[in-house]
């Protein structure tokens, strides 16, 4: 039995979960609404504000899907009730971030500023010139946008310059040693 899959998922009072016939789950809460279609073999039930996921057999595919489905549902419920955020730091001389409308503008050592437009449901905040915070209800989308921002100038191992996640430790290398 999947340790994650057999955990019961308690639904907060301000969140509503609706199940459709083709295993589509819609979760609505104070921060927004998320919808996702799950594998038809997974049995998803809602009883007394508790969400359960069951699998039909112990086949390898069903065992894998069991925990994954439970985790995705848990992230949906957490996303619409609390939301997710991912912090990024800009490290380097002259590296700075700013907002222009809803676009994020990054000056990270290129000859031109890099503009990133967030997709719908994703909010980008710039609390300071060297900090960027990506917020949203969908954990997958928040992580993907944060990864796209980091990929603009990922941290290099010699000086550590670049865009890194908050709390990320960059593995440093020693430069060439002189003879």
UniProtKB/Swiss-Prot annotation:
Q: Mind telling me which GO cellular component terms the entry cites?
A: cytosolic large ribosomal subunit
Molecular function (Gene Ontology), one example: rRNA binding
Q: Which InterPro entries match?
A: Ribosomal_uL6-like, Ribosomal_uL6-like_a/b-dom_sf, Ribosomal_uL6_a/b-dom, Ribosomal_uL6_bac-type, Ribosomal_uL6_CS
* Keyword annotations of the record: Ribonucleoprotein, Ribosomal protein, RNA-binding, rRNA-binding
Entry keyword annotation includes Transport: no
Query: Does the keyword section mention RNA-binding?
Result: yes
Q: Which Gene3D superfamilies match?
A: Ribosomal protein L6, alpha-beta domain
**Entry's Gene Ontology BP terms:** cytoplasmic translation
PANTHER family the UniProt entry points to = 60S/50S RIBOSOMAL PROTEIN L6/L9, LARGE RIBOSOMAL SUBUNIT PROTEIN UL6M
Q: How does it assemble?
A: Part of the 50S ribosomal subunit.
Which family is annotated? Belongs to the universal ribosomal protein uL6 family.
Role, per record = This protein binds to the 23S rRNA, and is important in its secondary structure. It is located near the subunit interface in the base of the L7/L12 stalk, and near the tRNA binding site of the peptidyltransferase center.
For this entry, the protein name equals Large ribosomal subunit protein uL6
Q: Which organism is it from?
A: Bacillus subtilis (strain 168)
Lineage per the UniProt record: Bacteria, Bacillati, Bacillota, Bacilli, Bacillales
């Amino acid at each position: 039995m999947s340790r994650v899959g057999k955990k019961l998922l308690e639904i907060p009072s301000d969140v509503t979960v609706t199940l459709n016939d083709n295993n589509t789950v819609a979760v609505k809460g104070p921060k927004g609404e998320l919808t996702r279609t799950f594998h038809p073999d997974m049995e998803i039930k809602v009883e007394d504000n508790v969400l359960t996921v069951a699998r039909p057999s112990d086949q390898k595919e069903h065992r894998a899907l069991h925990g994954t489905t439970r985790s995705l549902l848990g992230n949906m419920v957490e996303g619409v009730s609390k939301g997710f955020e991912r912090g990024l730091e800009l490290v380097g001389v002259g590296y700075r971030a700013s907002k222009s409308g809803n676009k994020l503008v990054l000056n990270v050592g290129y000859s031109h500023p890099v503009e990133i437009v967030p997709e719908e449901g994703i909010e980008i905040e710039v609390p300071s010139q060297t900090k960027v915070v990506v917020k949203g209800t969908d954990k997958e989308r928040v992580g993907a946008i944060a990864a796209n921002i980091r990929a603009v100038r990922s941290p290099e191992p010699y000086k550590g310059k670049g865009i890194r996640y908050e709390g990320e430790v960059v593995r440093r290398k020693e430069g060439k040693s002189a003879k």
